[in-house]
Structures are given as structure tokens and as C-alpha cells.
Amino acid sequence: MAHKKGASSSRNGRDSAAQRLGVKRFGGQVVKAGEILVRQRGTHFHPGVNVGRGGDDTLFALAPGAVEFGAKRGRKTVNIVPVARPEA
């Protein structure tokens, strides 16, 4: 078995697609329930009030409101603060 490849051959030339991780909704943005807030590997951000965590550590909104980033016990958290609608 040859261990040297022939001319004009290469063992390189492959790459994997990016995972599109990161913050998807920023502080102050108004979101609906179910919207993805942060895509992450591990818990860089922890779920706070009205925020759920998926099996792949994705954070999503459980209720409509405004996104708020904060910290609790030294951990970065993401909260959803209800937005008061003007009475019509």
C-alpha cells in the first residue's frame, strides 16, 4: 500500500460549517414567548426569570417581554421583564 499520494493530491481541504452560536436577542429587545435568546455550548449564560434552557443549553423566552442581561451569584443570567402595554 502506498503511503505517498500521487501528484496533485492532498489530504487537506476539508472544514466544518460554523455552528452559528452566540446572543440572538440583545438587552432591551422585545421578544415573544419561544424566541431563542442565546445559542451556546455549555452554560455561559444561565436562565433567569421567564427564560428556559433547552437540551443543548440554548436559552429561550418563556413569556413575552424585554430581554435583560444581569448577574446573580457571580453568574451571567438572562431575564425576560414583562412590558406594560398602553391601555387603549
Curated annotation (Swiss-Prot):
- UniProtKB keywords: Ribonucleoprotein, Ribosomal protein
InterPro entries of this UniProt entry?
Answer: Ribosomal_bL27, Ribosomal_bL27_CS
- GO:BP terms for this protein? translation
Q: Name one GO cellular component term.
A: cytosolic large ribosomal subunit
Q: Which GO terms describe its molecular function?
A: structural constituent of ribosome
Its family remark reads:
Belongs to the bacterial ribosomal protein bL27 family.
The molecule here is called Large ribosomal subunit protein bL27
**Native species:** Mycolicibacterium smegmatis (strain ATCC 700084 / mc(2)155) (Mycobacterium smegmatis)
Gene for this chain: rpmA
